[in-house]
């Protein structure tokens, strides 16, 4: 700031008396003020800091350049003090009623003032200055009517840089300035042409359009302001020269001053110019028509922008979908049971490549191949198997287990519902054609208006015929063959043009093309040329009948595709796979269940012939731990789980705590269960912990009867439903109280085995659990009331 204070006249902030706001320049607001010590009316532009504008103004001195007085350098008050133009800006003058007084001499004088001021900046100033923001708002009118150029906030010294940033206001900006390209002094020539157009037409350039819309029109569409047809030729030629797209073809301000002088010597020009200025109503419609056309282009641009955004959104979704798919290993085939060792090797290679950034898992693919892991064995691998193969990292094991579980889940889900892919080795296909009748109705909606020039119309296509016919139409295309209209393609009804078309040209026609789906053998498409004619009555529609020959395909087996249910997959392996999946799905729920139910739930499935038989047998809700004992005992039959849960909280010495529902079992049901119970001893069951190395177990798992202990009571519940080799039921005598509890998994004492054999004889057939109790030797108290006895009649009540 000290350097600035030394080079500029410094004006104290207290030496200024501020009045109203006169407007805003670039980078600051302008106020009318009084310089008290000099008794002079001035304009003060308040700034956040002093930059290039003060440096530029300090070296300029010209009649048509605003005069610079000094700067304010008192933080936080910074500003530039210049002369005050009492008549305001040229923009305000042009858009006020005062502009109606303008004539040829007025315009020529002011056009010359601006041209001389810009010529001084470019050629006569101590340093060449490119204004870059010349517009009617930055040209002010002094008290004597002389135009002065102000607001150099966007200006630059020419020898500093020619690559400019985006500044200024778009309607006045040259195309190269809008694009932030290197500029020369002729960019001010373009802006001068816009200011001259304002003085001639007294209109706002590109009125109603936003800045970015103007930028797109000027740069991309090469649009320019409309020069009315009745404008004097000399002015029109000068404007065209100033607005050349090639900056080198634009005239310099020295040439412009010369052109203005020659125009002043033309004696016929004043009459033409004054006639043009006074007949504004005749040519104003030309400017409005141009603005309407440009707005239509802008609307079309907005519509295309929305389409591009929607397309971009769909592409992002598709990209995300492809990314997700790329993270999933590609399967050699959907028949995982038929995978060879090489197929598994390929799958593991993809898996470790996706989930391994440090290349630590790259050796695992070879481990799978060395251990002869096929598709069947892959889906049955357990944690111990992976450790035996040499995979010791817990994280890597979890990664493999998760991938194998997902592969198993997808395979079982797709087993009966395979992907809809054509099998090259399948049954031969036979072709058959069917005929679908379709009537295409072509017409157009018409708003007559006053004639063919201002009427509005749009084409449509309707259908009639078989209801299924619409499904064979792929798309409908309307081509109006108009230069400013695009070809419209629609893929779903209603098939009608979206926008109205204004005016009907001579011999106007619309080409309508209906394209059919690939299964339509003939015709592939239908083309219709519809004539558009103006009429005050409703135009007649044209009907075109079409017969579609539809190609249908079906197999020799009555059109029923092959089923995966008769696949060559190993049924025993598939059943084991299903059981493993069920066990893994319910492991979390079993880990949260009541600790009294210590027996494995899925050991009950051992020895079943099929998955359906295993599911049919228990009929137990998965979330059995959430059912209360009382409700369950009233609503379900006394299966093993119901009894185990109910009697875990009941006193077994209650008089009426027996099973009244046990008598409801029919003899046929008991016989069926008895046969099934007897037959299953001879069957080999598939152990759930079978490994992929061929460990299909034919033995059943033996388990020790569990004992639950509650305060003051002991009971023993049969595990026959859980283990076929265990006695279905037994009772506990009082002398058992003195025997030690057994440890699960340890063999019983011989005396205990003999007792268990005696208890087997007391078991009823059918797999029902039978619980007996012994009453205490003492007789009931005579003080017990009938009301208390009645309370024991309800089965399942607790006695506390």
Swiss-Prot record:
The modification Phosphothreonine is found at residues 161, 586, 628, 664, 742. Residues 670-713 are annotated as: Sensing domain (S). Homodimer. Interacts with ZNF33A. Component of a signaling complex containing at least AKAP13, PKN1, MAPK14, MAP3K20 and MAP2K3. Within this complex, AKAP13 interacts directly with PKN1, which in turn recruits MAPK14, MAP2K3 and MAP3K20. Interacts with EIF2AK4/GCN2; promoting EIF2AK4/GCN2 kinase activity. Belongs to the protein kinase superfamily. STE Ser/Thr protein kinase family. MAP kinase kinase kinase subfamily. Keywords: Acetylation, ATP-binding, Cell cycle, Cytoplasm, Disease variant, Kinase, Magnesium, Metal-binding, Nucleotide-binding, Nucleus, Phosphoprotein, RNA-binding, rRNA-binding, Serine/threonine-protein kinase, Transferase. This is Mitogen-activated protein kinase kinase kinase 20. Its EC number is 2.7.11.25. ATP binds at residues 22-30, 45. The modification N-acetylserine is found at residue 2. Activated by phosphorylation by PKN1, followed by autophosphorylation on Thr-161 and Ser-165. Autophosphorylation in response to ribotoxic stress promotes dissociation from colliding ribosomes and activation. It catalyses: L-seryl-[protein] + ATP = O-phospho-L-seryl-[protein] + ADP + H(+); L-threonyl-[protein] + ATP = O-phospho-L-threonyl-[protein] + ADP + H(+). The keyword rRNA-binding applies. Ubiquitously expressed. Isoform ZAKbeta is the predominant form in all tissues examined, except for liver, in which isoform ZAKalpha is more highly expressed. Changing residue 45 to M: Loss of kinase activity. Does not affect ability to activate EIF2AK4/GCN2 in response to mild ribosome collision. Residues 652-800 are annotated as: Disordered. GO terms for cellular component: cytoplasm; cytosol; nucleus. One of its GO terms (biological process) is protein phosphorylation. GO terms for molecular function: ATP binding; JUN kinase kinase kinase activity; magnesium ion binding; MAP kinase kinase kinase activity; protein kinase activator activity; protein kinase regulator activity; protein serine kinase activity; protein serine/threonine kinase activity. The active site is at residue 133. Changing residue 165 to A: Loss of autophosphorylation activity. It is found in: Cytoplasm; Nucleus. Activated in response to stress, such as ribosomal stress, osmotic shock and ionizing radiation. Activated by phosphorylation by PKN1, followed by autophosphorylation on Thr-161 and Ser-165. Inhibited by nilotinib, sorafenib, dabrafenib, rebastinib and vemurafenib. Selectively inhibited by N-(3)-((1H-Pyrazolo[3,4-b]pyridin-5-yl)ethynyl)benzenesulfonamide compound 3h. Selectively inhibited by 1,2,3-triazole benzenesulfonamides. Residues 652-666, 686-706, 717-726 have a biased composition (Polar residues). Stress-activated component of a protein kinase signal transduction cascade that promotes programmed cell death in response to various stress, such as ribosomal stress, osmotic shock and ionizing radiation. Acts by catalyzing phosphorylation of MAP kinase kinases, leading to activation of the JNK (MAPK8/JNK1, MAPK9/JNK2 and/or MAPK10/JNK3) and MAP kinase p38 (MAPK11, MAPK12, MAPK13 and/or MAPK14) pathways. Activates JNK through phosphorylation of MAP2K4/MKK4 and MAP2K7/MKK7, and MAP kinase p38 gamma (MAPK12) via phosphorylation of MAP2K3/MKK3 and MAP2K6/MKK6. It comes from Homo sapiens (Human). Residues 667-678, 728-738, 750-763, 785-800 have a biased composition (Basic and acidic residues).
């Amino acid at each position: 700031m000290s350097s600035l204070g030394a080079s500029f006249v410094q004006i104290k902030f207290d030496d200024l008396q501020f009045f109203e706001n006169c407007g805003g320049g670039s980078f600051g607001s302008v106020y009318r003020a009084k310089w008290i010590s000099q008794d002079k009316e001035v304009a003060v532009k308040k700034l956040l800091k002093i930059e290039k504008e003060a440096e530029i103004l300090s070296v300029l001195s010209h009649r048509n350049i605003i005069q610079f007085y000094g700067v304010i350098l008192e933080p936080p008050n910074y500003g530039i003090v210049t002369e005050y133009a009492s008549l305001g800006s040229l923009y305000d003058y042009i858009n006020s009623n005062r502009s109606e007084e303008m004539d040829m001499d007025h315009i020529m004088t002011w056009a010359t003032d601006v041209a001389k001021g810009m010529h001084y900046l470019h050629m006569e100033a101590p340093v060449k200055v490119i204004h870059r923001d010349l517009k009617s708002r930055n040209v002010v009118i002094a008290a004597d009517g002389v135009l002065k150029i102000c607001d150099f906030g966007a200006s630059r010294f020419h020898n500093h840089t020619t690559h400019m940033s985006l500044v200024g206001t778009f309607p006045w900006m040259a195309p190269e300035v809008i694009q932030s390209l290197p500029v020369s002094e002729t960019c001010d020539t373009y802006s001068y042409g816009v200011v001259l157009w304002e003085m001639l037409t007294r209109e706002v350039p590109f009125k109603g359009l936003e800045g970015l819309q103007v930028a797109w029109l000027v740069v991309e569409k090469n649009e320019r302001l409309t020069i009315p047809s009745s404008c004097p030729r000399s002015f029109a030629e000068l404007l065209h020269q100033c607005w050349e797209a090639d900056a080198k073809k634009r005239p310099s301000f020295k040439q412009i001053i010369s052109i203005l002088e020659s125009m002043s010597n033309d004696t016929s020009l004043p009459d033409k110019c004054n006639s043009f200025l006074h007949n504004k109503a005749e040519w104003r419609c030309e400017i409005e028509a141009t603005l309407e056309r440009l707005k239509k282009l802008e609307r079309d641009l907005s519509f295309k922008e929305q389409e591009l955004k929607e397309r971009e959104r769909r592409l992002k979704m598709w990209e995300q979908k492809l990314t997700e798919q790329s993270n999933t290993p590609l399967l050699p085939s959907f028949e995982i049971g038929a995978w060879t060792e090489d197929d598994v090797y390929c799958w593991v290679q993809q898996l470790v490549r996706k989930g391994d950034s440090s290349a630590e898992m790259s050796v695992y693919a070879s481990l799978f191949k060395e251990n002869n892991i096929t598709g069947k064995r892959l889906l049955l691998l357990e944690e111990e198997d992976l450790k035996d193969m040499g995979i010791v990292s817990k994280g890597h094991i979890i990664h493999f287990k998760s991938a194998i579980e997902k592969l198993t889940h997808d395979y079982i889900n797709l087993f009966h519902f395979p992907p809809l892919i054509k099998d090259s080795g399948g049954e031969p296909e036979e072709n058959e054609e069917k005929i679908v009748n379709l009537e295409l109705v072509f017409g157009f909606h018409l708003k007559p208006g006053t004639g063919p020039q201002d009427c509005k119309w749009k084409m449509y296509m309707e259908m009639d015929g078989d209801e299924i016919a619409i499904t064979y139409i792929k798309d409908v295309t309307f081509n109006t063959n108009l230069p400013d209209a695009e070809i419209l393609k629609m893929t779903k009804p209603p098939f009608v043009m979206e926008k109205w078309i204004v005016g009907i040209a001579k011999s106007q026609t619309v080409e309508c093309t209906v394209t059919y789906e690939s299964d339509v053998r003939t015709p592939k498409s239908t083309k219709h040329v519809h004539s558009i004619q103006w009429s005050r009555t409703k135009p007649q529609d044209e009907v075109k009948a079409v017969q579609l020959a539809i190609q249908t395909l079906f197999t020799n087996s009555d059109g029923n595709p092959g089923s995966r249910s008769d696949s060559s997959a190993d049924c025993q392996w598939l059943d084991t796979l299903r059981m493993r999946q069920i066990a893994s799905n319910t492991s979390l729920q079993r880990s949260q269940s009541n600790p009294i139910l210590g027996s494995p739930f899925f050991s009950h499935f051992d020895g079943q012939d099929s998955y359906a038989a295993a599911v049919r047998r228990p009929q137990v809700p998965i979330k059995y731990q959430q059912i209360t004992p009382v409700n369950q005992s009233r609503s379900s039959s006394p299966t093993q789980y119901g009894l185990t849960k109910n009697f875990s909280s009941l006193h077994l010495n209650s008089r009426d705590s027996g099973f009244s529902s046990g008598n409801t079992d029919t003899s046929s049901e008991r016989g069926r269960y008895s046969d099934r119970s007897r037959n299953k001893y001879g069957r080999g069951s598939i152990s759930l912990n079978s490994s992929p190395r061929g460990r299909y177990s034919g033995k059943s798992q033996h388990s020790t009867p569990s004992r639950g202990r509650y305060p003051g009571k002991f009971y023993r519940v049969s595990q026959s439903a859980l283990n076929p080799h265990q006695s279905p039921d037994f009772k506990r005598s009082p002398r058992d109280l003195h025997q030690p509890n057994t440890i699960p998994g340890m063999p019983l004492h011989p005396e205990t085995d003999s007792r268990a054999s005696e208890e087997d004889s007391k078991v009823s057939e059918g797999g029902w659990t039978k619980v007996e109790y012994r009453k205490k030797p003492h007789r009931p108290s005579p003080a017990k009331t009938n009301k208390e006895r009645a309370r024991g009649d309800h089965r399942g009540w607790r006695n506390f």
